[in-house]
């Protein structure tokens, strides 16, 4: 049986921008994407800790080391600058092939979206 598991997560990142009139997506600092094993244009789930909104979009690479977390397009209606969000990617795997000790790549960030630990 194929199951869907959390592949990577950026935990409690702070939204730095919201650009309503931009191509719909989520721009994320490439350093954070790399640490969480996320790829450009990969589908992500975003959970807004402040207002409870949950939505899906795809990733656009942001400048390395910038701390950028930008809600673009319609997603800008679901959050605002300063909101905390959780960004999650998923993968599918045969259940029998998933090791019992499997752990997703999780990146915890500070208030400036700098990694605390991964």
UniProtKB/Swiss-Prot annotation:
It catalyses: L-aspartate + H(+) = beta-alanine + CO2. Disulfide bonds: none annotated. One of its GO terms (cellular component) is cytosol. It comes from the Bacteria. Is synthesized initially as an inactive proenzyme, which is activated by self-cleavage at a specific serine bond to produce a beta-subunit with a hydroxyl group at its C-terminus and an alpha-subunit with a pyruvoyl group at its N-terminus. One of its GO terms (molecular function) is aspartate 1-decarboxylase activity. It is an enzyme of class 4 (lyase). Keywords: Autocatalytic cleavage, Cytoplasm, Decarboxylase, Lyase, Pantothenate biosynthesis, Pyruvate, Schiff base, Zymogen. Its cofactor is pyruvate. Pathway: Cofactor biosynthesis; (R)-pantothenate biosynthesis; beta-alanine from L-aspartate: step 1/1. Belongs to the PanD family. HAMAP family: PanD. This is Aspartate 1-decarboxylase.
């Amino acid at each position: 049986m194929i199951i869907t598991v959390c592949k990577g997560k950026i935990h409690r990142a702070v939204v730095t921008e919201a650009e309503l009139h931009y191509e719909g997506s989520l721009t994320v600092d490439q350093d954070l994407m790399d640490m969480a094993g996320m790829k450009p244009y990969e589908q992500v789930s975003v959970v807004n800790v402040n207002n409870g909104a949950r939505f899906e979009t795809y990733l656009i690479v942001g400048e390395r080391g910038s701390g950028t977390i930008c809600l673009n397009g319609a997603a800008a209606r679901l959050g605002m600058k300063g909101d905390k969000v959780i960004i999650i990617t998923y993968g599918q795997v045969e259940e029998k092939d998933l090791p019992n000790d499997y752990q997703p790549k999780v990146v915890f960030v500070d208030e400036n979206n700098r990694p605390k630990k991964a």
